[in-house]
From Swiss-Prot:
Role noted for this protein: The SecYEG-SecDF-YajC-YidC holo-translocon (HTL) protein secretase/insertase is a supercomplex required for protein secretion, insertion of proteins into membranes, and assembly of membrane protein complexes. While the SecYEG complex is essential for assembly of a number of proteins and complexes, the SecDF-YajC-YidC subcomplex facilitates these functions.
Keywords, comma-separated and alphabetical: Cell inner membrane, Cell membrane, Membrane, Protein transport, Translocation, Transmembrane, Transmembrane helix, Transport
Subcellular location: Cell inner membrane
Record bears the keyword Disulfide bond: no
Pfam family, one: YajC
Lineage, highest ranks first: Bacteria, Pseudomonadati, Pseudomonadota, Alphaproteobacteria, Rickettsiales
Homology family: Belongs to the YajC family.
Membrane topology reported for the UniProt record: Single-pass membrane protein
Keyword check for Nucleotide-binding: no
GO cellular component, one term: plasma membrane
Protein name: Sec translocon accessory complex subunit YajC
């Protein structure tokens, strides 16, 4: 058996061949491949910024401006749904006093103001008057 195993080992040694292959150099630009993989992420972030973050920041600035410009005598709507008239504006502690009924006043934070309804009404009346003026001028010219 030992002679048989030696013959098998000799046959196995004879059958091992090493094939040589031609090596072709592949040029890769690592900078370019890195940029192409980053491009979609940059585009997604840009879309996210312009569709979500920028409008939200704009609304926040408008709201801060609205709250800072509230004056005594204006009708306001609070975030809890209470309508009232501003009777006192305190600049130093960011509070306002709102009269919600005759001789019923509440203290609230300026940040609780959602809308200044007296200004909204003025804008609505102006728009309505402009529409009426356009209809009247259109009827006169006919």
């Amino acid at each position: 058996m030992s002679a048989n195993t030696q013959d098998n080992q000799a046959n196995n040694n004879d059958t091992i061949e090493i094939q040589e292959t031609e090596v072709v150099p592949v040029e890769t630009n690592s900078l370019q491949s890195g940029l192409t993989s980053l491009t979609p992420m940059v585009l997604i972030f840009a879309v996210f910024y312009f569709l979500l973050l920028r409008p939200q920041e704009k609304r926040r600035k408008e709201r801060e401006k609205l709250v800072s410009e509230v004056k005594k005598g204006e009708e306001v709507l609070t975030n809890s749904g209470i309508y009232g008239i501003v009777t006192k504006v305190s600049e130093n502690d960011n509070n306002i006093e709102i009269e919600i009924a005759k001789d019923v006043r509440i203290k609230a934070l300026k940040s609780a103001i959602v809308d200044i309804t007296s200004r909204t009404k003025e804008v609505a009346v102006k728009k309505e008057n402009n529409k009426k003026d356009k209809k009247v001028s259109g009827a006169k010219s006919s």
